[in-house]
A protein has these predicted regions:
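Active-site SXXK
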Residues: 1, 48-76, 181-189
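Short, conserved catalytic-motif segment at the N-terminal edge
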Residues: 1-49, 69-71, 85-95
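Short, solvent-exposed loop/helix junctions and linker helices
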Residues: 5, 46-51, 114-117, 178
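Residues at or immediately flanking beta-strands
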Residues: 11-13, 75, 174, 214
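Residue-level detector of short, conserved catalytic/binding motifs and their immediate flanks
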Residues: 12, 53, 118-121
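Outer-envelope exported proteins of Gram-negative bacteria
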Residues: 13-17, 75-77, 201
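Short, flexible loop/turn elements at secondary-structure junctions
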Residues: 18, 34, 51, 124-128, ...
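Short, surface-exposed loop or secondary-structure junction motifs
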Residues: 80-230
Length: 230
C-alpha cells in the first residue's frame, strides 16, 4: 500500500480464487485517489497486463513443445528464415553493446556477423539479443524507435522490421531483457500457421473457460489510463 500512497504505483489489485469452487480466497485493493480520483476498480475491471503476457506466451510454447512441434535447441532461423543473417552491434573495440561501458558507446556502432546460432532457448531466457528502446546506447534506442515496430500490422511485418535491426549481443552471450518473448510468439505463429491470439484461445482460453483474458479489447470497454512511475 505504501507504494500506492507514494505514487510509485497508481493502484494495486489482487485476487485469489479457488479453482474448484470459484470462491474468492483473498482480495485486496489500494488506489491512489489523486492519480485515479474517479476510477472504480474491482475484479471486473479490464487492465493491461504488460510483461505478464510473457507467462502466457511461454506456457503456450511449452505446450507446443511437449507435442514435439519444436525443441529448445532448434535454431530460430529454422522457423523464421528472415533471421538467418542478423547482425550484432559492437563498439569500437569489437565488444557487443550489452557488454560495453557507456563511454564506449559512441554513435554510430559497427555491426558484425553473429558468432553463434540463435536457438529457441535463447528466446526463453532472454539471451537472444533482442531489446527494448531502453538500452545504454542512444543509437540502438533511436533505431528501434524509428523502425516503428508498434505500427506493424501483422507478425510477418514485425519480423521484417526486426530483421533490419542489429542485435545488442551475440546469441547466448549474456542475459539482456527485451523483445525475446515477443519473437517467441512470432515463432509460435510460424510453427502453427495461426495467430498467437488463436493459439491462446484454443489451448488456454476455451479449455479453462477463461473469459477474463484477451488479446483484443472487448467492445465498449475503456482501459485504465497509463502512468509513468517515479
Amino acid at each position: 500500500n505504501r507504494y500506492v500512497e507514494d505514487e510509485i504505483w497508481p493502484f494495486l489489485y489482487s485476487k485469489i480464487v479457488d479453482g474448484k469452487s470459484g470462491d474468492i480466497v483473498y482480495e485486496h485493493l489500494a488506489v491512489n485517489k489523486r492519480l485515479l480520483p474517479n476510477q472504480n476498480i474491482d475484479g471486473s475491471t479490464w487492465m493491461r497486463i504488460w510483461s505478464m503476457s510473457k507467462l502466457v506466451t511461454i506456457s503456450l510454447a511449452m505446450d507446443l513443445m511437449e507435442e514435439g512441434l519444436f525443441y529448445l535447441d532448434d535454431p530460430v532461423h529454422k522457423y523464421i528464415p528472415e533471421f538467418s543473417n542478423l547482425m550484432v552491434a559492437v563498439n569500437s573495440n569489437g565488444e557487443s553493446i550489452s557488454r560495453s561501458r557507456k563511454v564506449d558507446l559512441d554513435c554510430p556502432h559497427d555491426v558484425v556477423n553473429m558468432d553463434s546460432i540463435m536457438t529457441i532457448q535463447h528466446l526463453f531466457n532472454h539471451t537472444a539479443g533482442f531489446y527494448y528502446a531502453l538500452t545504454p546506447s542512444k543509437c540502438l534506442n533511436e533505431q528501434i524507435d524509428s523502425s516503428k515496430l508498434l505500427q506493424a500490422e501483422n507478425g510477418n511485418q514485425l519480423i521484417d522490421l526486426l530483421s533490419n535491426l542489429p542485435l545488442i549481443q551475440h546469441p547466448g552471450e549474456a542475459y539482456f531483457y527485451g523483445l525475446n518473448t515477443s519473437v517467441l510468439g512470432l515463432l509460435l505463429e510460424r510453427v502453427t500457421g495461426t495467430s498467437l491470439r488463436q493459439i491462446f484461445i484454443d489451448r488456454i482460453g476455451k479449455p479453462a473457460k477463461l473469459k477474463e483474458l484477451a488479446y483484443t479489447k472487448p467492445k465498449g470497454i475503456e482501459l485504465l489510463p497509463t502512468f509513468t512511475g517515479r
